[in-house]
C-alpha cells in the first residue's frame, strides 16, 4: 500500500521501515516543472541541459522521472540545434510513453536509461511495431547504451545512467543527421547524495578527471 495515496499494488521496493511510495506519488509535481524548463530552454548541449534539469528541486536523486527526462532532453537539444520537428507533439508523446516505464527497470527489466533513449529514437524516426525501415534504429541505440551501462557496472545511479544514455544517443544520432550537436564533458556533483555511488568506477566522478 502506497504510504501517500494508499493505493495497493505489487512492488519490489520498500524502505528500511517497510514503507512504499508508488511511482505516481514519487514523481508527482516533477513533470510540469521539467516540461516548462525544457520548452523555454535554448541550451544546445544535451549534457549541460540534462544537468540543468536534474538540478530542478522537483527532480529526485533517483526515480522514474529520469525515464522521461532522458528522451525529453534529447528532443529539446535537437530542437535547439535546428532539427526540424513538431516539438510540442513529440514532447507530449515522449512523456506519455516514458511515464509508463516503472521505477526499478534497470534491475528488474534490464533496460534502465536506455528505455528513455529508445523512446526518443522511436518518436524521431516514427517507428512502430510494424514499421520495417525505422524499427531497427531504436533497437540498435538501446543495445549500444545497454552495453555501455553494463561495462560501467552497478548498482544503479539515475544520474550516471542518464548521462551515459544521452552521450551514446547523441553519438548514434550524429551518424544519420547533418545537425551538429555539441557534447560537453561533465563532472558529477551528486555523489555525496548517493549512498550507492561507485566513486572511482564512475566516469563522471570528479577524481577521475
Question: Predicted segment positions?
Answer:
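Active-site-proximal helix-loop elements at catalytic-domain edges
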Residues: 59-89
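Short metal-binding segments enriched for Cys and/or His
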Residues: 19-39
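Conserved phosphate/anionic-ligand binding catalytic regions in large, soluble enzymes, centered on
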Residues: 66, 104-121
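Short, cysteine/histidine-rich loop/knuckle motifs that typically chelate Zn2+
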Residues: 1-7, 14-17, 24-27
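Short, hydrophobic/aliphatic alpha-helical segments
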Residues: 1-7, 46-57, 88-107
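Polybasic, low-complexity association/targeting segments
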Residues: 39-71
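A structural-propensity feature for long, helix-poor, extended segments
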Residues: 125-126, 131-174
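Cysteine-cluster motifs in flexible loop/terminal segments that predominantly coordinate metals
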Residues: 6, 25, 32, 180-209
Amino acid at each position: 500500500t502506497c504510504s501517500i495515496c494508499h493505493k495497493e499494488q505489487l512492488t519490489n521496493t520498500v524502505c528500511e521501515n517497510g514503507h512504499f511510495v508508488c511511482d505516481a506519488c514519487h514523481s508527482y509535481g516533477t513533470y510540469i516543472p521539467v516540461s516548462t524548463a525544457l520548452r523555454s530552454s535554448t541550451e544546445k548541449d544535451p549534457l549541460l541541459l540534462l544537468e540543468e534539469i536534474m538540478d530542478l528541486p522537483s527532480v529526485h536523486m533517483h526515480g522514474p522521472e529520469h525515464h522521461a527526462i532522458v528522451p525529453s532532453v534529447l528532443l529539446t537539444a535537437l530542437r535547439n540545434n535546428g532539427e526540424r520537428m513538431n516539438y510540442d507533439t513529440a514532447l507530449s508523446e515522449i512523456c506519455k510513453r516514458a511515464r509508463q516505464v516503472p521505477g526499478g527497470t534497470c534491475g528488474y527489466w534490464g533496460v534502465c536509461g536506455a528505455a528513455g533513449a529508445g523512446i526518443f529514437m522511436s518518436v524521431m524516426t516514427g517507428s512502430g511495431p510494424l514499421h520495417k525501415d525505422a524499427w531497427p534504429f531504436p533497437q540498435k541505440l538501446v543495445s549500444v547504451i545497454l552495453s555501455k551501462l553494463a561495462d560501467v557496472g552497478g548498482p544503479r545511479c539515475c544520474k550516471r545512467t542518464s548521462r551515459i544514455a544521452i552521450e551514446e544517443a547523441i553519438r548514434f544520432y550524429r551518424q544519420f543527421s547533418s545537425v551538429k550537436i555539441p557534447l560537453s564533458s561533465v563532472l558529477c556533483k551528486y555523489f555525496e547524495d548517493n549512498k550507492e555511488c561507485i566513486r572511482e568506477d564512475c566516469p563522471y566522478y570528479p577524481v577521475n578527471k
